[in-house]
Amino acid sequence: MPVNPADLDRAQRALAAALDGSGPPVEFAEDGRAILRPEAADPAAGGAEGVVAVVRTSGSTGTPKQTLLTRDALTASAEATAARIGGEGQWLLAVGPHYVAGLAVLSRSIAAGTTPAALEPGPFTAQSFAAAVDRMERGTGFRALSLVPTQLTRLLLPGSSGSSTDGPGPIAGFGGAAVDALRTFDAILVGGASVPRRLRDAAAEAGLRIHLTYGMSETCGGCVYDGVPLDGVTAELVHDPASGVPRLRLAGPMVSPGYFDDPERTHAHFGVGTEADPDARWYLTEDTGTVEGAPGAPGGQRLAVTGRVDDVINTGGMKVSAAAIQRVLESLPGVHAAFAGSVPDLEWGQRVCAAVVPEAEGAFSEAAARASIRDRLGPPAVPKQWLVVDALPLLPNGKTDRQDLLARFTPPL
């Protein structure tokens, strides 16, 4: 979790130096320390020109990568974000700067000429959040914050199963210091994982000004807000011959030049030139979705992410979507959170599996869930193996730890 004030100051100064050219590229450690990475700006060493930061991730699949971010990309991201959310001002750092969401808070603060506040090191709780907001500057105008869904759940719905031990139940009438603190922000960016409808509804009922963001390290963080690409960003669907489903491709000035010292993966995911702009850099994601509208057309584009390429499950010769199964489960009464995936199976090829976090003991009905999935998605989508858990395991960035969950299911039959 975020850093102490002294480390935050050093982190921002290190990134500012990289951005203005007086210092080398940086990578942030989990404790907020700035690690100097001069080789990241050297193409001969596996880097790229103009690189100012490196974001190291392993992702939910466990495959490590080092994403290179350039001065131009971070600047474009900061400017487009300010234009979309309606202003620049002071940010609260609630996500570590070793994640792209935290690094983006620093780069946006540098662009705005402000100093971010930060949570103290330690577990993220409603109390620590409210205390951090109290330390923010008064009367500075625009305030912004970036959270992952797990954090917002702990603030809005602290009694939800598996989310926190801060309170005995949901905040009555959405009161309390943490929710009052959330209301002081002009913009709350929520991304990094899907946001359940229950959480979106709770945020709306509490009167919070949230923006659901979509993006990744390769796009300097969120580049699509509330389903609409930021200025300069375009989206299109590209057929993926391996999976047989279309993949989302994002293009714009905030796209990374690639991965450090990984030319094969860089070639597979990055390129230059789209139908709308022959000079635009693009990134081919691992996500599936829909895109409505054309770049520059009235109303612009709207994008919806429906799942991941590796979420497509081929079971008994039929293709089903793990993301669609998860959405059905999370729409059911008594279900707080859910996960759907697959494991190898000698008979079916891939066996559909599901894990469910119930709202309360005995609140989940497997029979009702089976019937709902069968009615809405068809018999092949009905999970053949179920787990009921107290909480979904999470990676440090708040995303569901897919590998942990899949390892819990029975080995191939």
Indicate residue ranges for each PLM-predicted region.
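AMP-binding/adenylate-forming
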Residues: P25-V26, R71-A76, Q90-R154, H211
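Conserved pre-ATP/AMP-binding loop-to-beta segment of ANL
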Residues: A6-D9, P38-R56, G89-Q90
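AMP-binding/adenylate-forming catalytic domain of the ANL superfamily
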Residues: G378-T400
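AMP-binding/adenylate-forming catalytic core of the ANL superfamily
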Residues: G252, D279-R281, T288-A381
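Gly/Ser/Thr-rich phosphate-binding loop
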Residues: G159-D226, E236
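Conserved ATP/PPi-binding loop(s) of AMP-dependent carboxylate-activating enzymes
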Residues: P241-G273, V320
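Conserved AMP-binding A3 loop
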Residues: V52-E79, G86
